[in-house]
UniProtKB/Swiss-Prot annotation:
Residues 1-29 form the signal peptide. Pfam families: Pkinase, RCC1_2. It catalyses: L-seryl-[protein] + ATP = O-phospho-L-seryl-[protein] + ADP + H(+); L-threonyl-[protein] + ATP = O-phospho-L-threonyl-[protein] + ADP + H(+). Residues 512-789 form the Protein kinase domain. Residues 456-895 are cytoplasmic. Expressed in seedlings, floral buds, siliques, leaves, shoot apical meristems (SAM), and, to a lower extent, in roots. Residues 30-434 are extracellular. The chain crosses the membrane at residues 435-455. Residues 865-877 have a biased composition (Basic and acidic residues). This is Serine/threonine-protein kinase-like protein ACR4. Autophosphorylated and phosphorylated by ALE2. The gene is ACR4.
Length: 895
């Protein structure tokens, strides 16, 4: 009986140890597992992390396209680790590693060979290898003493084998060519692998005990066990200065390890960083070059992750956004990531729950993130409350003996008991309170006067009779010195959007039932509805979300743009509704849905309906709509989300460009870039815009080029069922090799006029060039597509630059539906006049202007027609993949 009790106690201790080690990994070294990780190398650097919404899904940011496009957005991970050109994570369901990116030594996906049924506690990645710690194995010796051993599986360069160690290990951390871990029994360090370049194994301080360790490129740093929590480092990269820091002393920066106690530590290539225990700020030491940015001061971090030459950390607070420092990576990353791993077990001693009620990263009931407790206070402060399971310790200033400005200002702003202290407090605060009251009264007066003037203005406008509106001139244009100019006041009155009531639209859409849904987006649903007059419409309803500001901005953007723009191939806005917290937009109904449904839907017959003539016609019509936005709206409009699901098809198979929620007004000079954070859809997103945050009309040209490849091939922009998941990376090599037949959609027979499709392929390849300035403008793209369509339709005059309007625009497309609705409105219905329209041209004007003048695109087309196909394709030679940030040059020059 006692034997069974002894075994039960040992099993309970073992389970507790496993749970503790699974949540204690608070920082990601060069190859440790955490909720955030960094991949590096010549292909570009990438930061990845688990989303802050508690979904355990991965989000990435950086310049390595293989990792960005290969990110498995549908898989849930326990933790992440990164190496040279690849990223790996531990799957939540199978507890097996899964990798993506590009590595010559590790198989992407689940690494092979993989033992059937094997489950892992944690994984760690080095430069070219990956190791995983299996769940503990418990055995029995002959003398009946229970022993624990560890089984570690490794894959990659000189590491593909199974290791069995006669001790229980945890906290795996990988260097460039080696791996280390902590012994659960005596807290000593154990390492294995190649130590020729690092000497890490021979230099292990065997008599020392550690709380945690982190391996760098060629060194290891660990936090010593005990109250002091000092850091100790060993290895070759922190001893031989000449081999690391360059030849000139002016290029060297050597920082010694800190003396303060640390909470966490991470290792880079030739340096290390840690989180200070008393204020959670970051500190770094080791070898740097003078171009490296230092660690930020005055801010705290939940977690750190190190790459080769830079470090990123998750800020404390509610934003959970990462910031980076060092060399070769942006300082700010537009993501929100989890500062740790969500667990549903109580926090172990020495840790506390992350308190963030406003935006909790853990969505499951009873789950939380555990963080280490702070054990000391900064100088001049004392501990007011100790660390508990629910919150960290609280430190306050000792106001009786202030020796710093921060202490004085903090103490002066808080009221204390006693008459003397109160008098001192009011003597400091009375001038501030007086100024605040005076400013508040001034602000109230300004707001009151402004409100009174606004109400007076609206009342005066309401008194204007309807006869005054009817007495305006019939023409929206007047002559000025022989030049035609638009009358903006008249255009403002004619460009109007009908105001619907919510009750009216709810009845039209049959109560917004799920059966009425005809489309869904990230922030809205589209319902089919029938108005009282029998008109079929599409009602776009914003989804209730916590991010109300973003939904409101997209609603306002689309309403303002579509109420001002008018073109045959832009989706027409009929009206809107904004009441009771609901935001709805009413459009004309597109009977045939989106181009995406035709090309990629499950119904094969629907795909076959779009023969080559219809596909190219849709491409021409979409191009004319985008050309109108770029060249005939003033200021230009940049759509930012051109894709097949935003190209809608009406009952006559005419195309309309839709969804202007992400659109922006561009500069009058279309060549000038806008500094904007990337927004759009992966696969269609301009790489130059994604990396440099420079937005121009050429970003829409890139997206349209991807759309052309999608129309020609029938493949999705990103389809991970293929080895080359990105359509651009797949199609461009085929075009360069002249293998056009392999590019075309196999569902359709090749047309007799194959030269027309070769023209379109050439246009698409030019549109997806890496640099925006090398791409053609939309007017040149439209001209080339119109000629290709004329040739495809068997037009005997292949030199005709412009197709007849009825071919391109559609025979019955005259904007009658929207005006018919306006004419049936009663006097009691609300109509809001939108702001002044931009100066624009009728849609047919673009064709006439391009026909009347020989543009650069026309001259280029005429010259290309006399060349052979192989010469034309050879001229398209250029790299499509993202540019390397220059790590190889940095290594060669500095190390």
């Amino acid at each position: 009986m006692r034997m069974f009790e002894t075994r039960a106690r040992e099993w309970i201790l073992l389970v507790k140890l496993v749970l503790f080690t699974s949540i204690w990994q608070l920082a990601s070294a060069l190859g440790s597992m955490s909720s955030i990780a960094i991949s590096y190398g010549e292909g570009g650097s990438v930061f990845c992390g688990l989303k802050s919404d508690g979904s355990h899904l991965v989000v990435c940011y950086g310049s390595n396209s293989a990792i960005l496009y290969g990110t498995p957005g549908h898989l849930q991970f326990i933790g992440l680790t990164g190496g040279d050109g690849f990223m790996c994570g531990l799957l939540m369901l199978s507890h097996q590693p899964y990798c993506w990116g590009n590595s010559a030594f590790i198989q992407m996906g689940v690494p092979q060979p993989m033992t059937k049924g094997a489950e892992y506690l944690e994984v760690s990645a080095g430069d070219y290898h990956l190791c995983g710690l299996r769940k503990p194995i418990v055995g029995r010796r002959k003398n009946s003493n229970i022993i624990s051993s560890s089984l570690v599986d490794c894959w990659g360069y000189n590491m593909t084998r199974n290791f069995v160690f006669d001790k229980q290990l945890h906290s795996l951390s990988a260097g460039s060519e080696f791996n280390c871990a902590l012994s659960s029994k005596d807290k000593s360090v154990f390492c294995w692998g190649d130590e020729n370049s690092s000497q890490v194994i021979s230099l292990i301080p065997k008599e020392k005990k550690f709380q945690k360790i982190a391996a760098g490129g060629y060194h290891v740093c660990g936090i010593l066990d005990g109250l002091e929590s000092r850091v100790l480092c060993w290895g070759k990269s922190l001893e031989f200065e000449e081999e690391v820091t360059g030849t000139s002393t002016e290029e060297k920066i050597l920082d010694l390890p800190p003396k303060e106690p640390l909470l966490a530590v991470v290792g880079g290539k030739f340096y290390a960083c840690g989180i200070k225990r008393y204020d959670h700020s970051a500190v770094c030491w080791g070898f740097f070059v003078n171009r490296s940015t230092p660690a930020p001061t005055g801010i705290g971090f939940y977690d750190l992750a190190a790459g080769n030459y830079f470090t990123c950390g998750v800020l404390t607070g509610t934003s959970m956004s990462p910031v980076c420092w060092g060399l070769g990576f942006p300082a700010s990353i537009p993501l929100a990531v989890s500062p740790g791993l969500c667990i549903d077990t109580p926090c172990p001693p020495g840790t506390h729950e992350l308190s963030n009620q406003e935006n909790s990263p853990c969505k499951f009931t009873g789950s939380h993130i555990c963080l280490p407790c702070s054990t000391s206070c900064p100088p001049g402060m004392y501990q007011k409350s100790v660390c508990t399971e629910r919150s960290d310790q609280v430190c306050v200033y000792n106001c009786s003996s202030c020796s710093s400005h921060d202490c004085s200002s903090n103490c002066s702003s808080s009221a204390t008991s006693g008459g003397k202290e109160k008098g001192k407090f009011w003597s400091l605060q009375l001038p501030i309170a007086t100024a605040e009251i005076g400013f508040a009264l001034f602000l109230v007066a300004v707001v009151s006067i402004t409100a009174a003037l606004y109400i007076r203005y609206r009342l005066r406008n309401c008194r204007c009779s309807e006869n005054d509106t009817r007495s305006s001139k019939d023409s929206a244009f007047t002559k000025d010195n022989g030049k035609i100019r638009p009358d903006l006041d008249e255009l403002q009155k004619r460009r109007r959007a009908r105001v619907f009531t919510y009750e009216e639209l709810e009845k039209a859409a049959d109560g917004f039932k799920e059966e009425s849904i005809v489309g869904k987006g990230s922030f809205s649903c589209v319902y089919k509805g029938v108005l009282r007059d029998g008109t079929t419409v599409a009602v776009k309803r914003a989804i209730m979300s916590s991010d109300k500001q973003k939904n409101s901005n997209e609603f306002r953007t689309e309403l303002d743009l579509l109420s001002r723009l008018n073109h045959a191939h832009l989706l027409s806005l009929l009206g809107y509704c904004e009441e009771c917290g609901e935001r709805l937009l009413v459009y004309e109904f597109m009977a045939h849905g989106s181009l995406h449904n035709h090309l990629h839907g499950k119904n094969k017959a629907l795909k076959e309906q779009l023969d080559w003539v219809k596909r190219v016609t849709i491409a021409v019509q979409a191009a004319r709509g985008i050309e109108y936005l770029h060249g005939y709206a003033c200021p230009p409009v940049i759509h930012r989300d051109i894709k097949s699901s935003n190209i809608l098809i009406d009952e006559e198979h005419n195309a309309r460009v839709a969804d202007f929620g992400l659109s922006l007004l561009g500069p009058v000079d279309s060549g000038s870039p806008l500094a904007e954070l990337p927004a759009g859809t992966l696969g269609y997103l301009d790489p130059e815009y994604y990396r440099l945050h420079y937005l121009t009309t050429k970003s829409d040209v890139y997206s349209f080029g991807v759309l052309l490849l999608e129309i020609l091939s029938g493949r999705k922009a990103i389809d991970m069922h293929y080895e080359e998941g990105n359509i651009v990376e797949w199609a461009v090599p085929l075009i360069k090799a002249g293998d056009i037949n392999a590019l075309l959609d196999p569902v359709l027979k090749h047309p007799s006029e194959i030269e027309a499709l070769k023209r379109i392929v050439s246009v698409a390849c030019k549109c997806v060039r890496m640099r925006g300035k090398d791409r053609p403008s939309m007017d040149k793209v439209t001209t080339a597509l119109e000629r290709a369509l004329a040739q495809l339709m068997g037009n005997p005059s292949s030199e005709q630059p412009i197709l007849p309007t009825e071919v391109v625009l559609g025979s019955s497309r005259m904007h009658k539906k929207s005006w018919r609705i306006g004419s049936k409105r009663s006097g009691s219905e609300n109509t809001e006049f939108r702001g002044g329209s931009w100066i624009t041209f009728p849609s047919v004007t673009s064709s006439q202007r391009r026909k009347s003048s020989a543009s650069e695109g026309d001259v280029a087309e005429e010259e290309d027609e006399g060349r052979k196909q192989q010469e034309a394709l050879r001229s398209l030679e250029e790299e499509i993949g993202p540019a390397s940030p220059g790590q190889s040059l940095f290594l060669h020059h500095n190390f």
